[in-house]
Amino acid sequence: MNEVDIFVIDEFYKLSFKNKTSEKYYDERVISLNVALSKLLTVSKQFYMIGPNIDFLRGLNNINEDFIFLSSDFNTVALNIFEYNILPNNESLKQSTTLSIIEKNNGQFIIYCKSPKVAESIASFLIKSGVSSDTNEEEYSLWLEKYYSQFWVYTKAIRHGIGLHYGTLPRAIQQYTIDLFNNKKVNILICTSTIIEGVNTNAQHVIIYDNRDGNNSIDKFTHNNIKGRAGRMKQHFIGNVHCLEESPEGKIEDSIVEIPIGLQDNTTPLNLIAGMQDEHVSSLSEDRLEEYLSANRLPKEIIKKHASYEINKVLELFNEIDWLKDSEISDLCFQRYPDKKAMNQISKNLLITSRQTFTRNSVSTEIEHISGMLFSYINAETHQTYFDSQLSRIINSQISEPEISELINRELKIIRNVFSYSIPKSLALQQDIINFICQKRKLNLTADYSFIINIFEKFHLPGNISALEEMGVPLQILQKINFPDDAIVDINKCIGYIKNVYFLNKTLSRLERKFIERALII
């Protein structure tokens, strides 16, 4: 991509590092976004960046002076704010207050909470309290029971007219839930931070149940962003926001967006510097990076290609692989399937790059467990056969229904965060380091991990088919369709083929056709 007419970044505040206890913290998404911004600024004739509640912008003028910044406090709807000042850990009072708000008001409700676990807890409480409405979506409920279980809280919630929305849900389920809400088939939508990440809804009432995102407090900026989900121009001209906890205090810093690539100093991550375009790298940053590279043996091209990784993790992985004997390097230079010895080393390498991800997603950090988990997924016939085996194990383990639901969510987290993201990302880095070392040692060997990377990244689907999952076609449908070779390599032909299946295949159920309709706008 060498020439672009215009690029647009929505929610551009995500370019800025967040502050926790007044210190910057590392966020690989911020790194990746800034690397992309640096590239786009060098190839695009124009740019347009949009975001809410932003009063000041810092850093952009240091790398591009040709722009106009406009700050506006214009609102398309009026908001009524109700404060309840409930203590954060008083769950029983927050639950009863939420129920009271729902019972006393008509219309639709979005409930923001800190985590999927809390979302399920709220849903279960509302169901037990008799909150229910008919969605007329029996076919969807049966589909959920077939592929995910009747014990899953999401399934139970849908049957009672309550929707759940959080990041680890399959894309098709996320998008279908929003459709049900916007079409008023579901009147209550319980969300995590996905509510402010591109989800378009039209609720009259917003209940801010928690002032946290995970374990971290949300600032005034994020709080205002959530409030902004109440009301909708031409539908609800007045929105109602119910803040259960005391609202966070506003600071001037909350409305400032800092662009890291334009504010380089001694704290700028070295991997961000390596990933930036040369014309955006300051002399200070250039000296820091060169000093680091000369003191260590890391090749700059690998750091640049894998800029989202902290540079010390890349160095640790490089040293781990470089310590291996030639025969051990040879074991890692497979083309399709690894043997047990290679998989154990890959698992060890994964702990260097992704230990926090494993821990955060409740994955054991025992080498044998990781190796067995990877083999189980790689050797499964399809993504669904793997998930079905996990589901069967969970349901037959003689535990309570809430525990079953919690373990189903854990499996979905592992699939979304570990299998389809962290593992293929780490494998690509491992492959490049191995091949660099082979070249350095003059070994006539090559590691090619593309086969297993695709298995994880694309849910066992060939070529570009997995892109349709991101668009909202469930994997369960995609696995049924035999795509021709040209459709596998060309996304436009892939979309054209599935449209033909939609029009000509009489075996698709009404629900399956509906999924395809909404994803491909048929």
Functional labels for PLM-detected ranges:
Residues N2-T42:
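SF2 helicase catalytic motif II
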Residues L41-F47, N53-I54, H205, R212-I259:
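Conserved segment of the helicase C-terminal RecA-like domain
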Residues V281-I522:
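C-terminal accessory/interaction regions of large nucleic acid-associated machines
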Residues V4-V8, I188-R212, N224, G239-L244:
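A short beta-strand element within the Helicase C-terminal
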